A protein has these predicted regions:
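Polybasic, glycine- and aromatic-enriched phosphate-binding surface used to engage nucleic acids
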Residues: 1-200
Length: 200
């Protein structure tokens, strides 16, 4: 649900108004209200200034993503979406034709395994959906020309897997190594060279 325009995420230039609990965005000539409780910061470098980051770049994003899941990674039920998040539900429903999975409608375009008529708005991929929620992490640029192991302490979501270009690394429970140490070790040119050799 990325082309021609993304559905789940938007940038700050699309926000036309902001209120205590909602933002109003402009999409396809219409304005939509999105509840802030379902929004998470989203790392997806699309502008020149956002690209070419390295390990010690300060991560910042002007993008937010609709995250219709609870902290355990369970999809928020459709009745709760309708009653507690009516603006977001109306927005997603307005884009039903682009979101409906193939297994729900023969007109569907997305591959979403196990989707039903009541879960049509779920993400196509859900692996590691909550693995890094409320967890400091390194965002790793998989296809970066320069080493990129950027520290994230702001709970930024990333697209990972496939050709997304990013994955995340967090400190293992019980590890004696601080995340900053892991970042420095991974960013070392010798370590990077070893990873290049092993990875090719």
């Amino acid at each position: 649900a990325e082309r021609p325009t993304p559905i789940y995420w938007f940038s700050s230039d699309e926000i036309v108004a902001e209120y205590a609990d909602t933002v109003e965005i402009s999409r396809d000539g219409n304005n939509y209200t999105i509840e802030k409780a379902l929004l998470r910061p989203y790392f997806k470098p699309t502008k020149k200034a956002e690209k070419g980051l390295n390990s010690y770049s300060i991560l910042a994003t002007d993008k937010q993503i609709i995250f219709p899941y609870d902290n355990n990674g369970h999809l928020i039920r459709i009745d709760e979406m309708q009653s507690s998040y009516p603006g977001t539900y109306a927005y997603l429903l307005a884009h039903y034709d682009r979101l409906v999975p193939k297994c729900v409608s023969r007109d569907g375009t997305r591959d979403v395994p196990n989707a039903t008529a009541d879960t049509w708005y779920q993400y196509g991929r859900t692996q590691a959906l909550t693995a890094f929620i409320n967890t400091p992490k390194l965002i790793v640029g998989v296809l970066s020309k320069e080493p990129m192991y950027a520290m994230d302490t702001n709970d930024i979501l990333i697209a990972s897997g496939g050709t997304a270009g990013y994955c995340a690394v967090s400190k293992k429970d019980g590890s004696p190594y601080a995340l900053e140490y892991i970042q420095a070790w991974l960013s070392n040119p010798i370590t990077e060279r070893i990873l290049e050799i092993v990875g090719s």
